[in-house]
From Swiss-Prot:
Protein name: UPF0173 metal-dependent hydrolase BCB4264_A4722
MF term (GO), any: hydrolase activity
Species per Swiss-Prot/TrEMBL record: Bacillus cereus (strain B4264)
Keyword field: Hydrolase
PANTHER family: UPF0173 METAL-DEPENDENT HYDROLASE MJ1163, UPF0173 METAL-DEPENDENT HYDROLASE MJ1163-RELATED
A Pfam family it matches: Lactamase_B_2
Family: Belongs to the UPF0173 family.
């Protein structure tokens, strides 16, 4: 399994001959190396409905005939836009031809904001994502605060690689993320959701230096880890 980081919370996984994108915020993302028009993808996994995570999902899904896996309300909202979706919910898992997906809790919000019409559409509960393929498991925490049930994620799953937000303000900051890493007990931890905007500026190298009992790795956009 090859896992690549593409800025903010964008993660690409290549496994079982398929390409999977998590939270494909590409257009308008100053930290990504990807352009939506160049991306080929078989499946898109979404943690929640905020624009900096849904991103280019509709365009990518339609262009590639890709399935979008998302929490129920968000999946329904996207299906009304002509997207092929597979709805799930917290605690549920499903085996796809590209791998197994399980949604975990995340403590955050989830909504679609239409700034032109000044409306906010509720898109269900936010989620973290456990993705398993080729006997390896990747945990993408989505946007979240620190919460004690992260201990359960670590106890019930053998996590090989975890992506944790460290930006603070909208999610947990570096100090809480260090504790999250301890509880999740992943072999390798990569920081995400930082330095995209001034309000979430952090030093990822200071974060990984504080990690204990795991390998911390800062990935620049386009860099990858092979599991």
């Amino acid at each position: 399994m090859k896992v690549s980081y593409h800025g903010h919370s964008v993660v690409k996984i290549e496994a079982n001959g398929k390409v999977i994108l998590i939270d494909p915020f590409l257009t308008g993302n100053p930290k990504t190396d990807l352009k939506a028009e160049d991306v080929k993808v078989d499946a898109i996994l979404l943690s929640h409905g905020h624009g900096d995570h849904v991103g280019d999902t509709v365009e990518l899904a339609k262009k590639n005939n890709a399935v979008v896996v998302a929490p129920f309300e968000l999946a329904t909202f996207l299906s009304w836009q002509g997207v092929n979706t597979h709805p799930m919910h917290i605690g549920g898992s499903h085996e796809f031809d590209f791998g197994k997906v399980k949604l975990t809790q995340a403590f955050h919000g989830s909504s679609y904001i239409d700034e032109e019409n000044k409306t906010i559409t509720y898109t269900g509960m936010p989620a973290g994502i456990l993705f398993t393929a080729e006997e390896k498991t990747v945990y993408h925490a989505g946007d979240t605060a620190l919460f004690s049930d992260m201990k359960l994620i670590g106890e019930l799953n053998k996590v090989d690689l975890a992506f944790l937000p460290i930006g603070d303000n909208f999610t947990m900051g570096p100090e809480d993320a260090v504790l999250a890493a301890k509880w999740i007990n992943a072999k390798t931890v990569v920081p995400m959701h930082y330095n995209t905007f001034p309000v979430i500026e952090q030093d990822p190298y200071q974060f990984v230096e504080k990690l204990q009992n795991c390998t911390g790795k800062v990935l620049e956009a386009g860099e990858s880890i092979t599991l």
